[in-house]
């Protein structure tokens, strides 16, 4: 999951809610151009986050904001922040508790979703062992919906285990995500309110990281198929 340690912008493309810690910013410095003289593909390549690991950034439907996960200080593990697409100050959107991942705007940009472990435990889960290479932790994530400022937090999934990697259909706002509720990591789809849950894949191995096509008639996703 954490394939990028910096977020880059291509300028030519376009229950009770827990208390939050004070809002902080991960943009510690002015956006700066990172294109080298040898660059042939990107017209304007800028670094817009500074400090910590910043990843899984997604555009608002209006193209004016980015939502992403970050572990810059003072966070002990990933939290969700939002910032203007031009790299302005970022604001904490998640609860500041547990670990979060995979945030996304809902259609209309008035609400967002993300996965979090904060109801399982307010503490950061133990990181996976990376001594033998990259390993994505299958923590006790559930998927939550909130207003775009992080208020009015509602839980959409409640099955034991891993529910995360959610993205949104731009047509009807339905959500596709990865879950291990069936005993394997499969793709599931639900309505924007968490209802009408149905399983989309049923093949041994990992299925995740799914995205809808623009008209939501197709999906693309990552898959691994163990042999033997």
Predicted regions and their residues:
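Sequence signature of WD/YWTD-type beta-propeller architectures
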Residues: 17-228
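Sec-dependent N-terminal signal peptides
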Residues: 3-12
């Amino acid at each position: 999951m954490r394939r990028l340690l910096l977020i880059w912008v291509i300028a030519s493309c376009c229950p009770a809610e827990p208390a939050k810690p004070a809002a902080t910013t991960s943009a510690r410095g002015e956006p700066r151009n990172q294109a080298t003289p040898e660059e042939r593909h990107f017209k304007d390549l800028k670094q817009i986050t500074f400090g910590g690991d910043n990843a899984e950034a997604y555009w608002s439907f209006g193209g004016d904001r980015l939502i992403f996960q970050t572990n810059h200080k003072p966070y002990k593990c990933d939290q969700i922040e939002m910032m203007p697409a031009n790299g302005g100050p970022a604001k904490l959107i998640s609860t500041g508790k547990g670990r979060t991942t995979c945030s996304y705007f809902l259609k209309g940009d008035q609400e967002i979703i993300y996965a979090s472990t904060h109801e399982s435990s307010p503490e950061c889960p133990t990181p996976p062992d990376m001594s033998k290479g990259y390993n994505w932790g299958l923590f006790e994530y559930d998927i939550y919906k909130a207003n775009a400022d992080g208020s009015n937090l509602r839980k959409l999934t409640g099955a034991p285990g891993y529910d995360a990697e959610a993205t949104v259909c731009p047509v009807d706002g339905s959500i596709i995500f990865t879950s291990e509720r069936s005993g394997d990591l499969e793709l599931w789809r639900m309505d924007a309110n968490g209802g009408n849950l149905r399983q989309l894949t049923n093949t041994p191995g990992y299925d995740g990281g799914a995205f809808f096509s623009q008209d939501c008639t197709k999906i693309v996703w990552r898959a691994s198929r163990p042999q033997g």
